[in-house]
Amino acid sequence: ALALKDADLGIAMGNGTQATKAVAQIVLVDSKFSVLPGVLSEGRRIIANMERVSSLFLAKTTYAAVLVIVTALVGWRYPFLPRQFSYIDSLTIGIPAFFLALWPNPRRYVPGFLKRTLSLAMPTGVILAAAALTAFGIVDGPPQSRESTAAILSLMLGAIWLLVITSRPLSTWKWVLLASVISATVGGVLIAPVRHFFSMVAPTGHEWFVIACVGACAALLVEVAQRIFYARKFKRSLEG
């Protein structure tokens, strides 16, 4: 029991003494060590996938905060309605995060979870907020929903690229997930009932060009941020 107390991870057999099981972190109910690889895989999946999903949520928190601050300072109206935020969140965070969190991930635990997550999420959030504000400023109404639509789609293009980054390495099912997100994003604008529900309008040719340019720049900058900040932090964590 004393040895288990001092161990990094105490493992006790189910048929062991009560004192041993009381101090152990893991108790093998059937007293078989053969179940440990499965326990290890489950732990790795939870920790590694938490890092993936956290980047998506923290990036959203960052760009929402930046948008509030900037629009308040410059006197612009906020680019999005609450229902439009639901549209963005569902397609770039909620639905993809559900599948990413459940998928197996064999990557071993690497210290520095919070620093790595913030090193990707915070720069990305600033980039996505800048993309939304740029498109919002370039595209003119009326109606006002025209500006919001451009801001939504520009931000979502960058957010989808963040989803690509957090999904790496890409497998068949992840390509299917990404294709579904992109199809739903475009479909939400093209399908009239959905478009009207989220108070969006069909972009003109010029507006599609603006959206594509701003969104592509946002995606490129997100990739650069990942390589400069996150990849370096991850390498240092491995070396440390």
Specify the residue positions occupied by each region the protein language model found.
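C-terminal transmembrane module of polytopic membrane proteins
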Residues: 135-240
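Membrane-embedded transport module
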Residues: 15-173, 186-191
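Acidic, divalent-metal-coordinating active-site segment for phosphoryl/phosphodiester hydrolysis
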Residues: 1-7
